Amino acid sequence: MLNQKLNPTPSEDLTIDVDLLYETDPCELKLDEMIEAEPEPEMIEGLPASDALTPADRYLELFEHVQSTKLFPDSKTFPDCAPKMDPLDILIRYRKVRRHRDFDLRRFVENHFWLPETLSSEYVSNPENSLKEHIDQLWPILTREPQDHIPWSSLLALPQSYIVPGGRFSETYYWDSYFTMLGLAESGREDLLKCMADNFAWMIENYGHIPNGNRTYYLSRSQPPVFALMVELFEEDGVRGARRYLDHLKMEYAFWMDGAESLALNQAYRHVVRMPDGSLLNRYWDDRDTPRDESWLEDVETAKHSGRPPNEVYRDLRAGAASGWDYSSRWLRDAGRLASIRTTQFIPIDLNAFLYKLESAIANISALKGERDTEALFRQKASDRRAAVNHYLWDDENGCYRDYDWRREEMALFSAASIVPLYVGMANHEQADRLANVVRSRLLTPGGIMATEYETGEQWDKPNGWAPLQWMAIQGFKRYGDDMLGDEIAHNWLKTVNHFYQEHHKLIEKYHISGGTPREGGGGEYPLQDGFGWTNGVVRRLIGLYGEP
């Protein structure tokens, strides 16, 4: 196993020789051997074919025309538009008139589509409200009621009410929702918790997994599998009994482990990788290898600069979106270049910790129901995963978890994702103590903990801090008895959010926390979003634990 330095400089381990031809990369040559291991996916299950179509599938060259000309500043706008008539009629009309000299694309789109509303655009916060009051008053603003499905819209109707993050995000998101739920529970909104619990269970029943979000263009991927954590929250807060979700947890597990039994050593299929010693670990994946509908132009431009087959780049970009860390140096071979993305080649520490939690939850609930064989099976699966993680993803020299590049058979970067094993109880006490020292020296700032120590311009890197990472770090270290570090992160984060709130009277998606006064976080493919679901949820929960900052 080849170990990189824990804190490499950009001129050393974090960069690659971009002059090397793609064809000469010995790792990438293995792709030829994996064609049968990673076949083209079948049609997406769970919806009638007509409703599973994404806007790119429906509108073909019209979609590409709109996106390639940047008709809207945000690439997500057009995929979220709803057609005013049958999409086939729209496409036929477009083909008839597009070559006319006086053809106006903007007018055509406005005549044939309803544009999405800007969420919460009319909401003005009361500057006299405390941070707690502000969050509690935002829940109704961010709540969307169930509605009839608009024919041919990309929005997937849900049976119950749900919370959206805010800003450009007008749909519910899988892993965001867990951290939002923490705050809903603290605010006493058990009604919304029940609705969201039913929605996620419904999606598993109908789609076989929880999609990235409730849009057709999100059906081909999921997000970090946190449903087991949601079920635990439902049980703790008396919202729903955990036993009713055992079948749903098993279905989600089957989605993530699909194809595992057929894999030979060093082979992968969808989300599963069989390691050289026969153990099974997981990676992020998307069943499509085309530009994302919601970031179509950005993906096309990224692929142009990669030197790789575009479909491979698109797959890795999509898998990066499935990770929730879109994007980060974690997925890049060259830290300053998004075109070097290789998400599917990495075994992520956080994903495998979440799946350990899923396996453990299935075992625990099976025990409650007296299903002893299932309990024993999943206890063994969790034990096997922990052993594999310790073998491949634990850096004993530096005392931290790191992602693993399974193609190159070497450890990858250190990041705040390393705290997830503590959050789910997968680490031992020695690992937790050693990791605490690394987090203190590498990621901790007066504003919280940063996503990584590498400044790349990507939003899930230095200098940004994100609410879910703070929560998992706080609770993870406290779980292993390090109350001092957990409390320090909590107070630092509350101070960051409150300082920004006192000046701007809003909560935002991410914060710049590396030195100086906390301010808006930057980087990424879209402007900073306010609202913001998971920031509200984590901060509201922390206020319940620590009081108003």
Swiss-Prot record:
It catalyses: alpha,alpha-trehalose + H2O = alpha-D-glucose + beta-D-glucose. The active site is at D326 (proton donor/acceptor), E509 (proton donor/acceptor). Its EC number is 3.2.1.28. It is an enzyme of class 3 (hydrolase). It is found in: Cytoplasm. One of its GO terms (cellular component) is cytoplasm. Keywords: Cytoplasm, Glycosidase, Hydrolase. Its main location: cytoplasm. Disulfide bonds: none annotated. Substrate binds at R168, W175, D176, N212, R221, S222, Q223, R292, D293, E294, G324, E525. Pfam families: Trehalase. GO terms for molecular function: alpha,alpha-trehalase activity. PROSITE patterns: TREHALASE_1 (PS00927), TREHALASE_2 (PS00928). Pathway: Glycan degradation; trehalose degradation; D-glucose from alpha,alpha-trehalose: step 1/1. SUPFAM superfamilies: Six-hairpin glycosidases. One of its GO terms (biological process) is trehalose catabolic process. Hydrolyzes trehalose to glucose. Could be involved, in cells returning to low osmolarity conditions, in the utilization of the accumulated cytoplasmic trehalose, which was synthesized in response to high osmolarity. Monomer. Belongs to the glycosyl hydrolase 37 family. This is Cytoplasmic trehalase. It comes from Salmonella typhimurium (strain LT2 / SGSC1412 / ATCC 700720). The lineage of its organism: Bacteria, Pseudomonadati, Pseudomonadota, Gammaproteobacteria, Enterobacterales.
